[in-house]
Design a protein with these regions (language model features):
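Beta-propeller folds
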Residues: 1-167
Length: 167
Protein backbone atom coordinates (compact mmCIF):
# COMPACT_ATOMS: atom_id res chain seq x y z
CA UNK A 1 0.00 0.00 0.00
CA UNK A 2 1.32 3.47 -0.87
CA UNK A 3 -0.21 6.95 -0.73
CA UNK A 4 0.30 9.29 -3.66
CA UNK A 5 2.61 12.25 -2.87
CA UNK A 6 -0.42 14.58 -2.57
CA UNK A 7 -2.29 12.10 -0.30
CA UNK A 8 -5.34 11.98 -2.60
CA UNK A 9 -4.93 8.43 -3.87
CA UNK A 10 -3.84 5.06 -2.50
CA UNK A 11 -2.22 2.34 -4.60
CA UNK A 12 -2.27 -1.28 -3.50
CA UNK A 13 -1.60 -4.74 -4.85
CA UNK A 14 -4.26 -7.43 -5.08
CA UNK A 15 -3.21 -11.07 -5.28
CA UNK A 16 -5.43 -13.26 -7.46
CA UNK A 17 -5.27 -16.94 -8.43
CA UNK A 18 -3.19 -16.01 -11.49
CA UNK A 19 -0.90 -13.27 -10.16
CA UNK A 20 -0.76 -9.78 -8.67
CA UNK A 21 -2.76 -6.77 -9.92
CA UNK A 22 -2.21 -3.06 -9.21
CA UNK A 23 -5.22 -1.07 -8.01
CA UNK A 24 -5.68 2.57 -7.02
CA UNK A 25 -8.25 4.17 -4.70
CA UNK A 26 -9.44 7.74 -5.23
CA UNK A 27 -9.96 8.81 -1.61
CA UNK A 28 -12.38 11.67 -2.40
CA UNK A 29 -14.62 9.43 -4.52
CA UNK A 30 -14.13 6.32 -2.36
CA UNK A 31 -13.66 4.37 -5.60
CA UNK A 32 -11.14 1.61 -6.39
CA UNK A 33 -9.94 0.99 -9.97
CA UNK A 34 -7.78 -1.82 -11.31
CA UNK A 35 -4.82 -0.46 -13.28
CA UNK A 36 -3.08 -3.64 -14.45
CA UNK A 37 -3.72 -7.27 -15.23
CA UNK A 38 -2.21 -9.86 -12.89
CA UNK A 39 1.32 -9.22 -14.21
CA UNK A 40 2.89 -7.25 -11.35
CA UNK A 41 6.14 -8.80 -10.06
CA UNK A 42 5.84 -8.65 -6.27
CA UNK A 43 8.65 -11.12 -5.50
CA UNK A 44 10.97 -8.60 -3.81
CA UNK A 45 10.38 -5.31 -2.06
CA UNK A 46 7.59 -2.98 -3.04
CA UNK A 47 6.41 -3.72 -6.58
CA UNK A 48 5.38 -0.10 -7.23
CA UNK A 49 6.25 3.50 -6.34
CA UNK A 50 4.39 6.75 -6.97
CA UNK A 51 6.08 9.35 -9.15
CA UNK A 52 5.97 13.02 -8.10
CA UNK A 53 3.32 13.97 -10.67
CA UNK A 54 0.64 12.11 -8.61
CA UNK A 55 -0.63 10.61 -11.89
CA UNK A 56 1.98 7.93 -12.63
CA UNK A 57 3.13 4.82 -10.79
CA UNK A 58 6.42 3.04 -11.50
CA UNK A 59 5.60 -0.69 -11.52
CA UNK A 60 7.72 -3.86 -11.65
CA UNK A 61 6.01 -6.14 -14.18
CA UNK A 62 6.71 -9.71 -15.21
CA UNK A 63 8.56 -9.75 -18.55
CA UNK A 64 6.37 -10.60 -21.52
CA UNK A 65 8.83 -13.31 -22.64
CA UNK A 66 9.23 -14.88 -19.18
CA UNK A 67 10.31 -18.52 -19.31
CA UNK A 68 8.70 -21.24 -17.20
CA UNK A 69 10.45 -22.24 -13.99
CA UNK A 70 12.67 -25.31 -14.17
CA UNK A 71 11.44 -28.43 -12.38
CA UNK A 72 14.32 -29.98 -10.44
CA UNK A 73 12.76 -33.43 -10.85
CA UNK A 74 12.64 -33.17 -14.66
CA UNK A 75 15.39 -30.73 -15.62
CA UNK A 76 18.80 -32.09 -14.74
CA UNK A 77 21.74 -29.77 -14.09
CA UNK A 78 24.30 -29.56 -16.89
CA UNK A 79 27.24 -30.46 -14.65
CA UNK A 80 28.32 -31.46 -11.16
CA UNK A 81 28.07 -29.24 -8.11
CA UNK A 82 31.63 -28.58 -6.99
CA UNK A 83 32.43 -27.25 -3.57
CA UNK A 84 35.94 -26.63 -2.26
CA UNK A 85 36.61 -27.35 1.41
CA UNK A 86 40.18 -27.38 2.63
CA UNK A 87 39.38 -28.13 6.26
CA UNK A 88 40.35 -24.66 7.51
CA UNK A 89 38.13 -22.64 9.83
CA UNK A 90 35.73 -20.29 8.08
CA UNK A 91 34.25 -16.96 9.17
CA UNK A 92 31.06 -17.54 7.13
CA UNK A 93 27.75 -18.05 8.86
CA UNK A 94 25.26 -20.64 7.72
CA UNK A 95 21.85 -19.60 6.38
CA UNK A 96 18.76 -21.64 5.49
CA UNK A 97 17.17 -21.73 2.03
CA UNK A 98 20.19 -20.84 -0.08
CA UNK A 99 20.65 -21.40 -3.80
CA UNK A 100 21.91 -24.95 -4.18
CA UNK A 101 22.54 -25.60 -7.89
CA UNK A 102 22.31 -24.21 -11.43
CA UNK A 103 18.54 -24.88 -11.57
CA UNK A 104 18.08 -22.71 -8.47
CA UNK A 105 20.15 -19.96 -10.12
CA UNK A 106 18.05 -20.06 -13.30
CA UNK A 107 14.78 -20.04 -11.35
CA UNK A 108 16.01 -17.25 -9.06
CA UNK A 109 16.93 -15.06 -12.03
CA UNK A 110 13.58 -15.84 -13.66
CA UNK A 111 11.62 -14.92 -10.53
CA UNK A 112 13.61 -11.74 -9.85
CA UNK A 113 13.55 -10.32 -13.39
CA UNK A 114 11.10 -7.48 -14.04
CA UNK A 115 10.42 -4.84 -16.64
CA UNK A 116 9.76 -1.36 -15.25
CA UNK A 117 6.62 0.35 -16.54
CA UNK A 118 5.12 3.76 -15.99
CA UNK A 119 1.40 3.18 -15.40
CA UNK A 120 -0.93 6.19 -15.41
CA UNK A 121 -4.24 6.38 -13.58
CA UNK A 122 -6.28 5.25 -16.59
CA UNK A 123 -4.21 2.03 -16.76
CA UNK A 124 -2.01 2.91 -19.74
CA UNK A 125 1.37 1.23 -19.26
CA UNK A 126 4.54 2.46 -20.99
CA UNK A 127 7.81 0.52 -20.85
CA UNK A 128 10.32 2.60 -18.86
CA UNK A 129 13.27 0.18 -18.42
CA UNK A 130 14.00 -3.16 -20.05
CA UNK A 131 14.10 -6.43 -18.12
CA UNK A 132 16.61 -6.66 -15.28
CA UNK A 133 16.72 -7.92 -11.69
CA UNK A 134 15.44 -4.72 -10.02
CA UNK A 135 15.86 -4.82 -6.25
CA UNK A 136 14.79 -1.28 -5.40
CA UNK A 137 14.29 2.28 -6.51
CA UNK A 138 14.66 5.66 -4.87
CA UNK A 139 13.48 9.03 -6.15
CA UNK A 140 15.39 12.23 -5.43
CA UNK A 141 13.57 14.67 -3.11
CA UNK A 142 12.54 16.86 -6.07
CA UNK A 143 11.42 13.82 -8.09
CA UNK A 144 13.68 14.66 -11.04
CA UNK A 145 16.05 11.72 -10.59
CA UNK A 146 15.61 8.02 -10.01
CA UNK A 147 18.22 5.64 -8.60
CA UNK A 148 17.67 1.97 -9.46
CA UNK A 149 19.35 -0.93 -7.69
CA UNK A 150 19.80 -4.18 -9.60
CA UNK A 151 21.04 -7.59 -8.47
CA UNK A 152 24.14 -8.74 -10.36
CA UNK A 153 25.71 -12.11 -11.10
CA UNK A 154 27.49 -14.21 -9.99
CA UNK A 155 25.05 -15.51 -7.39
CA UNK A 156 26.36 -17.04 -4.20
CA UNK A 157 25.48 -20.41 -2.70
CA UNK A 158 26.72 -19.40 0.77
CA UNK A 159 25.24 -15.94 1.49
CA UNK A 160 21.65 -14.62 1.35
CA UNK A 161 20.17 -12.31 -1.29
CA UNK A 162 20.97 -9.24 0.81
CA UNK A 163 24.69 -9.95 0.26
CA UNK A 164 24.53 -10.63 -3.49
CA UNK A 165 26.36 -8.14 -5.72
CA UNK A 166 24.28 -5.14 -6.75
CA UNK A 167 24.66 -2.08 -8.92
Amino acid sequence: IAWSPNDKKISFSHTTATGVELWVIDVALAKATRLTEATVNANIGSPFSWMNDNETILVKMLPKNRAALLDAKKDLPTGPIISNADGAKSQNRTYPDMLKNKNDEINFENIMTSELYKVNLNGTATLFKKADMYAGESFSPDGNYLMLTTIQKPFSYIVPLSRFPSK
